[in-house]
Amino acid sequence: MFKVDLNSDLGESFGAYKMGMDEEILKFVSSVNVACGFHAGDPCVMDKTLNLAKQNGVCIGAHPSYPDLLGFGRRNMQISFEEAKNYALYQLGALFGFAKAKDMKIQHFKAHGALYNMAAIDENLALALCEAVASFDENIIFLGLSNSAMNEAAKKKGLKYANEVFADRAYNDDGTLVSRKLEGALIHDENLAIKRVIKMIKESKVTSINGKEIDLKADSICVHGDNVKALEFVKKIKENLEKEQIQICALENFI
């Protein structure tokens, strides 16, 4: 039987500002990526998010970012190896404090936004993130884009790696994600997106935006639940995976 993790970004509210439908999405995913304060989230939000994850039996991961609250972590920054490593360690430590207080463990590490996209193509940046994770806890799974520089960096640092794919995003011919700024970057046809997900899991292939068949591995599918329509889409994905006899379970069960 095929196994796959369903992950979603959570805990991205901040102060008086609410973002996402965290309580609802937790019913359908097996792992969540928790914002650690640099692009979103704050101490009270982190506390609430971990409480919700624990109540629903969902595994947690750190979701660190460039220090960019105003830009929601989606703007690139030129930072050194040491800065990248220390930013990651700082945010891991923040999440660990809450996790330890609740007798929970950090299952995985997944970079956010621009940090994720840059680490997918910049091995030096990816190595900095992997070094941070390895020095913090070598048992934490590094979750990153399938067939990217992050995969190679994780191997070099001796970390377990989980290949992530996206249900609603288009791919370039080289396996990177099409920029959100470009037309066609987001796939709005739910049935098409679900067919693509099943193909990625069962055949380890996806068709790029230019029609090229590319190889990738799907250990975890990133889904979003930040509005009612997105939440309904997640329900459909889960239902269709179960129909295809694909088992949904957290990364720690098979990576």
Swiss-Prot record:
SUPFAM superfamilies, per the entry: Glycoside hydrolase/deacetylase (SSF88713)
CDD domains in the record: LamB_YcsF_like
Molecular function as annotated in GO: 5-oxoprolinase (ATP-hydrolyzing) activity; ATP binding
Coiled coil spans: none
Keyword tRNA processing: no
Keywords: ATP-binding, Hydrolase, Nucleotide-binding
Biological process annotations from GO: carbohydrate metabolic process
Catalytic reactions of this protein: 5-oxo-L-proline + ATP + 2 H2O = L-glutamate + ADP + phosphate + H(+)
Subunit-level organization: Forms a complex composed of PxpA, PxpB and PxpC.
Summary of the function given for this chain in its UniProt record: Catalyzes the cleavage of 5-oxoproline to form L-glutamate coupled to the hydrolysis of ATP to ADP and inorganic phosphate.
Name by which UniProt lists this protein: 5-oxoprolinase subunit A
Species the sequence originates in: Campylobacter jejuni subsp. doylei (strain ATCC BAA-1458 / RM4099 / 269.97)
